[in-house]
Design a protein with these regions (language model features):
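Extended, compositionally biased flexible segments
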Residues: 71, 77-82, 90-91
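Conserved PLP-enzyme active-site core in the AAT-like
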Residues: 4-26, 33, 42-49, 53-56, ...
Length: 422
C-alpha cells in the first residue's frame, strides 16, 4: 500500500498515476534543487554582508524612526534582488496595493503607462481605470495619466515592433512576468531583457517596471539583473516564504524607490518613517526561507503538470519545461471538473479542510470565481491554492505549496476529485 493511502483514500488507478509521475519528475526536481541551493547561498551571503543581529528583529512603534531592523531588511532585499535599494514594508496590503503605490509614485499627469505585455491582471485594471467602474475613485486615469498597451501576439509572445513604436511616448514600460488569467507561460529573464532593450532603444529615458509576483527565486537571477529599473512583489507570495503575514516590496534604482516611498508615506518623509511593530522576525525569516519554499512550490507544479498530462490535460507550462513562476494553468473543460479540482485541494489543506469552495463574485473580477485556499495566511498564494473563473474553457490556476509531501497529497486528491469520481 502507498504511504499516501495511510492518510487519504486514493483509488488504485490514481496511485498508479502518482507512481509514474514521480518517476518522470525526478530530473526536473533535481534541477530546481540546484536553483534553490544557489539562491539560498546568495541569501545567506546577503544576511552576512548586512551584519543583521537578533536585536534587528525587535520592531518599532510610532513613527518608526531609526529602525535599524527595517533598514537592514531592505538592504538584504536590495542585494538579493540585484537592486540599488528596496522598500520592504508591512504597510503594503497586497501585490495590487504595492503595484499601485509604485505606479502612482512614478507617474504624473500627462505621463503614459505602456503595458508591454498586454492587458494587465484583472485587479490592476481597476487601479489604472480600465474596468469602467472606478471613475472618480482616484485611478491613474482620474489623475490624468494615460494608458497604452502593446498586446501580445497570437502565440503569446511580445510584439517587439509595436513596443518600439509605442515606447517613445511612454514614461513607464510595464512588464507582467506571470500570466494573470491568460494561458501562457511566465516570461523568462531573456524575454524581459529583450523587452527592456527594445523599449530603451526607442526611448532611453523610459522606466522599465516589472510586476515580479510569483516569479521570485524561480531562477538564479531577478529582473533587475535583466534590464528592469524597478521590480514589485508581494510578501504573501514567493519572497515571504509562507511566514511573512503581510507586506510587499519594491526594489530597483535608488531614485525610483525613493519616489515610491514618498507615495507610500508622504512627500518629504520617504523611507525614514514606518514602524514595524512585531513583523520584522517573520519578514526576515520568511525571506530567508523563501528559496527553499519556492523550490517546494515548483516541485509541486512540476508534479501537478506531469499528473495532469497523464490524465490527458495540457498544462502550461509542461513539467519538462523551464519554470519562471510558480503557477500552473490548465483547462478543466467543465465547470464540474474545475469545482471538483478546487474542492480536492481544499480537502487536503491544513486549514479549513472541511470547507467546500463555491463559485462567487469577487472584487476586481468580471466573472464568478472559485477559489481554494486552506492557508495559514489569508490570500497567500505561496501556500497551495487554486482558483479559476467560471467561464469556458474553465481554466484552473494552481500555485504554491509550502512543502512537497503535503502538496503532492493535495494535488493527487484534486485530480481524483475532478477526473476519477466514478
Amino acid at each position: 500500500m502507498s504511504m499516501l493511502n495511510h492518510f487519504f483514500d486514493y483509488k488504485a488507478e490514481v496511485l498508479a498515476l502518482d507512481e509514474k509521475a514521480m518517476e518522470l519528475c525526478q530530473p526536473y526536481f533535481r534541477h530546481m534543487e540546484e536553483i534553490r541551493d544557489y539562491n539560498q547561498l546568495k541569501m545567506l551571503k546577503a544576511f552576512a554582508d548586512t551584519q543583521m543581529s537578533s536585536t534587528d528583529m525587535l520592531g518599532t512603534t510610532g513613527y518608526g524612526l531609526w529602525d535599524s531592523g527595517r533598514a537592514k531588511l531592505e538592504q538584504i532585499f536590495a542585494e538579493v534582488m540585484g537592486a540599488e535599494d528596496a522598500l520592504v514594508r508591512s504597510q503594503f496590503q497586497s501585490g495590487t496595493h504595492t503595484l499601485a503605490v509604485a505606479l502612482f509614485g512614478l507617474l504624473r499627469a500627462g505621463d503614459t503607462l505602456l503595458a508591454a505585455t498586454g492587458r494587465p491582471y484583472d485587479t490592476l485594471e481597476g487601479v489604472i481605470g480600465l474596468d469602467g467602474k472606478g471613475k472618480g475613485t482616484g485611478t491613474l486615469m482620474d489623475y490624468g495619466i494615460r494608458y497604452d498597451e502593446a498586446p501580445l501576439k497570437a502565440d503569446f509572445t511580445p510584439d517587439y515592433a509595436l513596443i518600439a513604436q509605442k515606447a517613445p511616448g511612454a514614461k513607464v514600460c510595464h512588464i507582467q512576468r506571470s500570466r494573470g488569467y491568460l494561458q501562457r507561460n511566465a516570461f523568462d529573464l531573456d524575454t524581459i531583457q529583450k523587452i527592456a532593450d527594445t523599449a530603451r532603444a526607442a526611448n532611453p529615458e523610459i522606466i522599465i517596471f516589472v510586476d515580479n509576483c510569483y516569479g521570485e527565486f524561480t531562477q538564479t537571477e531577478e529582473p533587475c539583473q535583466a534590464g528592469a529599473d524597478l521590480v514589485v512583489g508581494s510578501l504573501i507570495k514567493n519572497p515571504g516564504g509562507g511566514i511573512a503575514p503581510t507586506g510587499g516590496y519594491i526594489a530597483g534604482r535608488k531614485d525610483l524607490v525613493e519616489l515610491c516611498a514618498y507615495r507610500l508615506n508622504a512627500p518629504g518623509l520617504g523611507k525614514e518613517l514606518g514602524c514595524t511593530l512585531e513583523t520584522p522576525r517573520d519578514m526576515y525569516l520568511g525571506f530567508y526561507y523563501a528559496p527553499g519554499v519556492v523550490c517546494e512550490a515548483i516541485k509541486t507544479a512540476i508534479y501537478a503538470q506531469c499528473l495532469l498530462e497523464l490524465v490527458g490535460k495540457k498544462p502550461i507550462p509542461r513539467y519538462c519545461e523551464d519554470h519562471n513562476d510558480i503557477v500552473t494553468c490548465f483547462d478543466a473543460d467543465t465547470a464540474d471538473a474545475l469545482i471538483g479540482f478546487c474542492r480536492g485541494i481544499q480537502a487536503a489543506s491544513p486549514v479549513d479542510s472541511y470547507a467546500a469552495p463555491e463559485p462567487s463574485p469577487e472584487p476586481g473580477y468580471t466573472d464568478e470565481v472559485i477559489m481554494a485556499s486552506g492557508s495559514f495566511t489569508q490570500g497567500s498564494t505561496i501556500e497551495l491554492s487554486c482558483d479559476g473563473p467560471l467561464r469556458e474553457p474553465y481554466t484552473c490556476y494552481l500555485q504554491g505549496g509550502l512543502n512537497f509531501a503535503a502538496s503532492r497529497a493535495g494535488v493527487l486528491l484534486a485530480v481524483q476529485n475532478a477526473y476519477f469520481k466514478d
